[in-house]
């Protein structure tokens, strides 16, 4: 038979809705479910006990119902924050429209299994690069305000505050107390982290707890907390104080401290040590300056002791005398060169004069030229044919010239 369609005219009564929901839920059958106990309501006189089981990785929970005798039969008493695996059947109560898981078996999650899960999470986050040193944010040298997330009235809080103020009395703290174990720890720590990260006056955040068992420290290995730390803009210091099974928070934090006291020492500089360092640096600087001045004085004295600076005019005098000697030598050489060249010129003149026509004429020779009748330039007579009888001649002698006429030509024998 087909289901009756649901409409305003044919609305289901509540009993029918609850009946249908109950039938749907009961189809799931028996299930194994894992979670963290956040609330346990049990009294020895009660036949049934009621437990709230929370998913540590998400904001989700479910109500458990079990026989009180089942809780008494467990090897150890259950407490808030315990990780357990339960076996039960989903149940829906029609009368009040509520859901619960009817549990018939409860098994605590062993330490070995918890450590194995932590290691798997560590490997997963490492493969995502969340442990990369390049992601680590540097801590300020001198933080003005430190955010501190820790348990209320805990030894971790007292240690961090005492050590920090002993090292630098002016440092300020913004302390947020949260649960540091159990089901409420992770959401409270994440909320505190986000509040401090949003505060611009906070320079660094310390998450501190003074050690504990593996089960107690499980919140500091929850994936949600690790991703919140990575997403923070403010440097985060992990100070959980547990060896050797350190929580995953140590890997994702920007700095890991072995204990809360160690965190205070790493975050806050020691004012006495800084003053001592300043005094040492001042002393070294003064010594270096004195050494430099002494060295410069020695170099200045060495420069002053040089002869050129002892008698600066002496160098000028020496150069002046050298220049005078050079000028005298040059003049002497020039006079010698001029005298030599004059003698050479005179000798050449004598040679030229001896070979020239004037010298030849002076020895009684003459140059005979025929003067053409057309008025052209006279020509030297070298043959008798050039001066036929009747030609006008000009005879050049040593002291002048003679005009004559050719009377007769006689050829040589």
Swiss-Prot record:
GO terms for molecular function: exodeoxyribonuclease VII activity; nucleic acid binding. Heterooligomer composed of large and small subunits. It is found in: Cytoplasm. Its main location: cytoplasm. It is an enzyme of class 3 (hydrolase). InterPro entries: Exonuc_VII_L (IPR003753), Exonuc_VII_lsu_C (IPR020579), OB-fold_nuc-bd_dom (IPR025824). Keywords: Cytoplasm, Exonuclease, Hydrolase, Nuclease. The keyword Oxidoreductase does not apply. It holds the Pfam family tRNA_anti_2. The gene is xseA. Bidirectionally degrades single-stranded DNA into large acid-insoluble oligonucleotides, which are then degraded further into small acid-soluble oligonucleotides. It catalyses: Exonucleolytic cleavage in either 5'- to 3'- or 3'- to 5'-direction to yield nucleoside 5'-phosphates. NCBIfam families: xseA. GO terms for cellular component: cytoplasm; exodeoxyribonuclease VII complex. It comes from the Bacteria. Belongs to the XseA family. It comes from Corynebacterium diphtheriae (strain ATCC 700971 / NCTC 13129 / Biotype gravis). This is Exodeoxyribonuclease 7 large subunit. Disulfide bonds: none annotated. GO terms for biological process: DNA catabolic process. Its EC number is 3.1.11.6.
């Amino acid at each position: 038979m087909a289901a009756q369609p649901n409409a305003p005219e044919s609305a289901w009564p509540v009993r029918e809705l609850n009946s249908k929901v109950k039938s749907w839920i009961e189809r799931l059958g028996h299930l194994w479910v894992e979670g963290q106990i956040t609330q346990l309501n049990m009294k020895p006189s009660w036949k049934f006990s009621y437990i709230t089981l929370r998913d540590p990785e998400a904001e989700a929970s479910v109500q458990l119902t079990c026989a009180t005798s089942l809780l008494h039969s467990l090897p150890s008493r259950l407490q808030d924050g315990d990780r357990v695996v339960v076996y039960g059947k989903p149940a829906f109560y029609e009368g009040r429209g509520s859901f619960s898981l009817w549990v018939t078996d409860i098994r605590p999650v062993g330490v070995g299994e918890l450590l194995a899960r932590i290691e798997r999470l560590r490997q997963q986050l490492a493969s995502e690069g969340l442990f990369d040193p390049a992601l680590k944010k540097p801590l300020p040298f001198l933080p003005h305000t430190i955010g501190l997330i820790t348990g209320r009235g805990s030894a971790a809080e007292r240690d961090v505050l005492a050590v920090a103020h002993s090292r630098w009395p002016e440092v300020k703290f913004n302390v947020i107390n949260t649960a540091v174990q159990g089901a409420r720890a992770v959401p409270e720590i994440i909320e505190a982290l986000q509040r401090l990260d949003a505060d611009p006056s906070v320079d660094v955040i310390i998450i501190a707890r003074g050690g504990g068992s593996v089960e107690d420290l499980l919140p500091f290995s929850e994936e949600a907390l690790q991703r919140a730390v990575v997403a923070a803009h403010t440097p985060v210091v992990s100070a959980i104080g547990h060896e050797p099974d350190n929580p995953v928070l140590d890997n994702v934090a920007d700095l890991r401290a072995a204990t809360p006291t160690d965190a205070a020492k790493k975050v806050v500089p020691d004012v006495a040590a800084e003053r001592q360092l300043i005094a040492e640096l001042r002393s070294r600087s003064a010594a270096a300056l004195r050494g430099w001045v002494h060295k410069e004085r020695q170099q200045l004295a060495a420069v002053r002791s040089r002869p050129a600076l002892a008698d600066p005019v002496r160098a000028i005098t020496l150069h002046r005398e050298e220049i005078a000697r050079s000028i005298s030598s040059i003049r002497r050489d020039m006079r010698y060169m001029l005298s030599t060249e004059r003698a050479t010129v005179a000798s050449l003149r004598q040679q030229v004069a001896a070979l020239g026509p004037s010298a030849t004429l002076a020895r009684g020779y003459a140059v005979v030229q025929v003067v053409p009748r057309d008025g052209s330039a006279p020509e030297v007579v070298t043959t008798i044919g050039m001066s036929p009888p009747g030609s006008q001649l000009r005879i050049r002698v040593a002291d002048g010239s003679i005009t004559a006429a050719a009377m007769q030509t006689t050829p040589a024998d």
